Swiss-Prot record:
InterPro entries: Helicase_ATP-bd, Helicase_C-like, Helicase_RapA, P-loop_NTPase, RapA_C, SNF2-like_sf, SNF2/RAD54-like_C, SNF2_N. Interacts with the RNAP. Has a higher affinity for the core RNAP than for the holoenzyme. Its ATPase activity is stimulated by binding to RNAP. GO terms for biological process: regulation of DNA-templated transcription. Belongs to the SNF2/RAD54 helicase family. RapA subfamily. Transcription regulator that activates transcription by stimulating RNA polymerase (RNAP) recycling in case of stress conditions such as supercoiled DNA or high salt concentrations. Probably acts by releasing the RNAP, when it is trapped or immobilized on tightly supercoiled DNA. Does not activate transcription on linear DNA. Probably not involved in DNA repair. The gene is rapA. Residues 162-332 form the Helicase ATP-binding domain. SUPFAM superfamilies: P-loop containing nucleoside triphosphate hydrolases. Keywords: Activator, ATP-binding, DNA-binding, Helicase, Hydrolase, Nucleotide-binding, Transcription, Transcription regulation. The keyword Transcription regulation applies. Its EC number is 3.6.4.-. This is RNA polymerase-associated protein RapA. It comes from Haemophilus influenzae (strain PittEE).
Length: 923
């Protein structure tokens, strides 16, 4: 059928888009706008998966104005249809097809049944189960959290759930080194992408970390990002195309944007939804002279709705630098540094009160006054009385309620997440070994002996410079044939990736990785547990960064730190200062840089000449440092923001979330569904044992391509621990693209839409007709509203006997399906022809019955949406009165969403998705 502008067509692959209208046409493509979903699609005319929608005389037509009427006549004029319709006022009116409502139900299952396109009964069962699983997954609170290839770390899951559920989140992720900020950012992003809150994402990272982010996003989250650099962008300049509009998920380097201002302008014009900046502490800012990098990130942050900044801890940054990050997130709120400092001081009494609540101590009168001042709108006297009561359960409830109220009103608690090792338990120990040598030149011999003694271990070696690392590699290779990889800042990103992969290879890889102290930034090697400091890093932060390559989440063993140096050498004395003064080898030392600056003059003498200080003078320096460290530690502990820590690690709720995902990991439900899906589609399966299988395409599959299935096959596992150990395997969860798109493949395709089966039952007369009808209640609405969380496509099952009685509740689906036998296609077609009028009558009866079942589902969805969105709006409005970090724009968006959501849910409808005709026989 020829295309014409104004015609109405249906997408066969995306029924949920509703009825589309042709808006543009050329020799090769047709453009269709789908008003119900506010989406546009462009199709190749030769292969367009479209169905022309033509209504017949006697059918009911829905007008876009909201009324319905019976079609009296149909006329075709130049390819466009005009319907003569009787409207509700009993008037005959002409309706052009462009005025037909875009929200429309299609009984394609019936059409397939009567046109001899009858599927097997097992295909119908797969379709119904798929619809049920689809509904369950849209409603699941674990959606977007469980699919990450990572361990179930409670604080990471808490942050991902808390931030991921927000509208346009703008937050600072400032966990200590090794606690997984990259994973947190990826989980937040995945959550937002799943909810369709964001679609276009820009990630800006240091040049050395580009490939690592690219690999992490793909390996852990199945997100395919594009890497942008000048060479790639130059290809688009000839066509005058903004390169940033050619991809939705983009990674680029900070240095590249800094040196190419024209690319910043293009990024500003590309309308991204989400900005992620790693190592944001490198953005230098002061009130008088902010850096160029800070300024262009500020420009991007002003126009991109969602912003995630990954940065060092506030203790490491210093207050001014910390303020600069917060200023990027909310310049209206953080407009003046001195005001910010005063506000931070104001929270100290509240922190003290929280300490008392956590320690189950009685609240002092001063603490009660501070709590009352902060919670002005809440009557806290009953809670104070409960805390003073003798009822332990009542006491704990009141303490938790007060703590939660204080967290909600915390100064930066909504914008800042900072977990510390002190707050996150379960890390292995660090064990420091100082190796005293006769001479500095003995280090190479010691290293060779050490490597020979630990042949089966992976060893990470830190050198001061790239030259030292290169020289060491040559010596190890030539003298002992020790396989070593080199890693330093002068290598290209690809060379560093290859070196890291060579070191990570457990079978044929390098035993040792020789890295410059700067070159290792951002790289993680927690599969190794031995660190050799061939040269000592020049400051405490650099030392912590080097140790943090191994000592991080995922490390299973104690980290052994070896420091070989000559007795009384400058390196030896500096190592003693790190160890005895800072205790920086065996514990993290957030005050390290402050002490390094405080004793800079003395340390400079030690580093330049080991005898510049006498032993007594050096011992005095160690004592002074230790005393200053203890004093700073006490001050830090006093200023330790327990409210922020509670908000960041999530406590019992975070653990409960991890436990829920672990329970789902152990459930056989996904495995059973996936294997049945692969089997019916025609995907070949080879069991490898040990919780893994190889799946491969075949020439007899029901579909041309199965999502994510390569021609050579894919090894998959449903086991999280195995997936973490074997990166070459795909980790299948309900969130994996192969499963999600497999569900979409079935739900949006024709598999199982019309089926027929035989029921052997001696109690029923032979030839008794039953019909199973599966309707789907859904809302055809814009994606951004995320109405699937309230009303996902919801299947309603009817089982009608030949008198039109619904037995769906009395006869369970699986019980009935297990008793059915297949029918040959020819016999099935003959039976359908013979029973057509009865089948049509039963379908009409089903259409009448489903209304009473669908309307309560829609009403409940509206009620849920109203309650949930209203509760969040009311909560934010109450908090905004006492916490300036709540943005009015966030409340405005939620109010707009509530109005639009309720309006769209009122338009929700239902359609017949699939049916199964069942004929009985005695045998």
């Amino acid at each position: 059928m020829p295309f014409a502008i104004g015609q109405r067509w249906l997408s066969e692959s995306e029924n949920a888009l509703g009825l589309g209208v042709i808006t543009a046409l050329d020799q090769r493509t047709v453009t269709i706008y789908f008003p119900a979903a506010d989406e546009t699609r462009i199709y190749a005319i030769a292969q367009a998966p479209l169905s022309r929608i033509v209504f017949s005389k006697g059918e009911t037509l829905s007008h876009q104005a909201g009324w319905q009427g019976e079609i009296l006549d149909v006329q075709n004029m130049n390819g466009l249809l005009f319907y003569l319709v009787k409207n509700p006022q009993d008037e005959d009116v002409i309706v052009q097809e462009r005025d037909i409502s875009p929200i429309i139900s299609f009984s394609q299952a019936k059409d397939r049944l009567f046109s001899a396109q009858i599927d097997r009964s097992t295909h119908f069962a797969l379709r119904y189960r798929t619809l049920c699983h689809q509904q369950a997954q849209f409603k699941s609170p674990l959606r977007g959290l469980r699919g990450t290839r990572a361990g179930l770390i409670p604080h990471q899951l808490h942050i991902a759930a808390e931030v991921g559920n927000r509208v346009n989140p703008r937050v600072l992720l400032a966990d200590e080194v090794g606690l997984g900020k990259t994973i947190e950012a990826g989980m937040i992003l995945q959550n937002q992408l799943f909810a369709e809150k964001v679609q276009r994402v820009l990630i800006i990272v240091p040049e050395t970390l580009q490939h690592q982010w690219l690999v992490e996003m793909l390996r852990r989250f199945n997100l395919h990002f594009a890497l942008f650099d000048e060479e790639r962008c130059n290809d688009f300049d000839l066509d005058a195309v903004n390169p940033f509009t050619t991809e939705s998920l983009i990674i680029c380097s900070l240095n590249w944007l800094e040196t190419h201002p024209n690319r910043v302008e293009q990024a500003l014009d590309a309308q991204f939804d989400c900005l992620i900046v790693d190592e944001a502490h490198h953005l230098v800012w002061s009130e008088t002279s902010p850096s160029a990098a800070y300024l262009f990130v500020e420009q991007l942050a002003r126009i991109i709705p969602s912003v995630l900044l990954l940065t060092a801890t506030p203790e490491q940054l210093g207050q001014e630098s910390h303020f600069a990050r917060l200023r990027l997130l909310d310049p209206e709120r953080f407009f003046d540094y001195q005001t910010f400092v005063k506000e931070q001081e104001h929270y100290q009494p509240v922190v003290n009160a929280v300490e008392s609540l956590l320690a189950n101590k009685a609240l002092s009168a001063v603490e009660k006054n501070h709590i009352s001042d902060l919670l002005l709108e809440q009557d806290v006297e009953p809670l104070f009385k409960a805390i003073a009561s003798n009822n332990d359960e009542e006491q704990q409830r009141a303490r938790q309620e007060l703590i939660q109220a204080l967290i909600d009103r915390h100064g930066t608690g909504r914008m800042l997440f900072r977990n510390t090792r002190q707050g996150v338990k379960g890390f292995p120990h660090r064990v420091y070994h100082q190796i005293t040598l006769s001479e500095e030149n003995d280090k190479i011999d010691w290293l060779i002996d050490f490597l020979k003694l630990h042949r089966d271990e992976k060893i990470f070696v830190i050198c001061q410079t790239a030259a030292t690392a290169i020289q060491l590699e040559q010596i190890l290779r030539e003298r002992e044939a020790i396989r070593a990889a080199v890693f330093h800042e002068k290598m290209s990103i690809i060379e560093r990736d290859r070196a890291a992969a060579y070191f990570a290879d457990l079978e044929n890889g390098a035993q040792v990785l020789l890295s410059s102290s700067i070159g290792s930034e951002g790289r993680n090697f927690q599969f190794a547990a031995n660190l050799v400091l061939f040269d000592l890093p020049t400051n405490p932060d650099l030392l912590e960064q080097c140790i943090g390559r191994l000592d991080r989440i995922g490390q299973k063993r104690d980290v052994q730190i070896y420091m070989p140096c000559a007795k009384d050498s400058p390196q030896s004395r500096l190592a003693r200062w790190y160890n005895e003064g800072l205790n920086a080898f065996e514990q993290t030392c957030p005050m390290g840089m402050a002490l390094f600056s405080q004793f800079a003059d003395e340390l400079e003498k030690v580093r330049s000449n080991s005898t510049a200080l006498s032993e007594n003078e050096f011992s005095g320096l160690l004592k002074q440092t230790k005393t200053a460290r203890e004093k700073l530690k006490i001050e830090l502990e006093k200023g330790r923001d327990r409210l922020l820590e509670l908000n960041s690690h999530g406590g019992e709720q975070a653990q409960a979330l991890a436990d829920q995902i672990a329970d789902e990991d152990n459930s056989p439900e996904l495995v059973n569904f996936a294997l049945k899906l692969f089997d019916i589609i025609g995907v070949e399966q080879e069991d490898l044992g040990a919780n893994s299988i190889v799946i491969s395409p075949t020439g007899t599959m029901l579909v041309p391509d199965f999502p994510g299935l390569k021609e050579e096959g894919v090894t998959v596992t449903f086991d999280r621990e195995l997936a973490l150990a074997r990166e070459e395997m795909e980790f299948l969860t309900w969130d994996h693209p192969m499963i999600r798109q497999g569900i979409d493949l079935v739900a949006s395709g024709d598999i199982g839409k019309a089926a027929m089966a035989l029921l052997v039952n001696k109690q029923l007369p032979a030839g008794t007709l039953l019909i199973e009808l599966i309707y789907v209640v859904e809302s055809q609405s814009p994606k951004g509203l995320q109405l699937n969380r309230f009303l996902p496509p919801t299947p309603i099952r009817l089982l009608l006997d030949n008198k039109g009685n619904n037995m769906g509740e009395q006869v369970a689906f699986e019980t009935l399906h297990s008793k059915l036998k297949p029918l040959g296609k020819n016999i099935a077609n003959q039976m359908v022809k013979m029973a057509r009028s009865n089948i049509e009558s039963l379908i009409t009866r089903g259409d009448q019955l489903v209304k009473s079942l669908a309307e309560p589902i829609i009403a409940e969805a509206k009620n849920q949406a109203d309650q949930q969105l209203s509760a969040e709006i009311n909560r934010l409005q109450a908090l905004r009165a006492v916490n300036k970090n709540i943005r009015q724009s966030e409340i405005d968006i939620l109010e707009q969403q509530r109005t639009q959501s309720l309006d769209e849910l009122s338009k929700a409808n239902w359609r017949l998705d699939c049916l199964r005709v069942i004929v009985t026989n005695k045998e």
